[in-house]
Amino acid sequence: MQKITFRKLIGENYIYPELQGHFIEFLGSCIYDGIWVGEDSEIPNYHGIRKDLVDAFQKLHPPVIRWPGGCYADVYHWRNGIGPRENRPVTYNENFGTFESDPNQFGTHEMMEFCEMIGAKPWFNINMMTGSPAEMREWMEYCNRRESTTLTRERKVNGHEAPFQVEYWGIGNEVWDGGGKMTPQMYADEYRKFTSSCPSFGSGDQAFPPKCIASGPDGNKPKERVAWTKDFFKEMGKYRMPSLYGYDLHFYNWNLKQLQTEK
C-alpha cells in the first residue's frame, strides 16, 4: 500500500514557481508567426525567433514552458524537428481545428534556444498515442545523455555540444479524450510501461533521472475528475510504484459563464 502525506504549511505562503509556467503548441499562430518567423524574416528575430516576443518574455521570466503539446504532442515525432531545417519533413496538423502543414522548423533545438533566451526550464511532452517507449527513450537520450553515443554525437553535429538537461517530461496528454480515450486503469498501465523505459542518466550524485508528470483528469467535469483521480492512483498504488513527479490537471474556462457586475 502506497501512502501520500499532505503537510499543511501554517504561516507560509510559498507557491512553487513551476506552477506559474506557460504552454506553447502548434495551434493557430502560436508557433509559426507567433514565436518562429525564420532567420530570413523581415520581422526582427534572434536566429528565427521573434525578437519582440523574446524581449517581452525576458521581463516575465516564465519558470517553465511546456511543448510540443497538448494534443499535438500525441502526433509529434521529435526526429522530424532536428537536423538542417531545409531537410526536415513536412507533416500535417489536424488538432483543434488547425488544419495546417507543419514544416517542422521549430523543433527541439529551437525550443531549447527559446527557453535559454528567456530563462525558462523546458517541459517536453512525449508522444504516447502514436509514439512508443523506444521513441521517448531516444528523445531523452538525445537531450540529456553525457556519454558519447550515436544519439549524443548527432546532437553535437546539430549544434549543441552539452546535454540540454531537460528535467520535466509529460507522459501523455489528456489521455481521457484525444490522447487515447483511455480509462484510468488503461492509462496507469501505459504510464508504468513508459516511465519504466526512462533512462536514469547515471547513478548516485551524477544521476539526472527524468521528472515524469502524469496526465490528470478532465477538470471541467467535477464528478469525473474525482473518480478518474481516485481510480488512477488506486492503480498506481498496486505493487511497485512507478516514477511520478507531478500530476497535470487540465481546467478550461469555456464552459464558465461570465459574471456581469453593475457599475
Which stretches of residues belong to each language-model region?
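Non-catalytic accessory regions flanking glycosidase/transglycosidase catalytic cores in CAZymes
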Residues: 1-246
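Extended catalytic-interface subdomain
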Residues: 222, 240-263
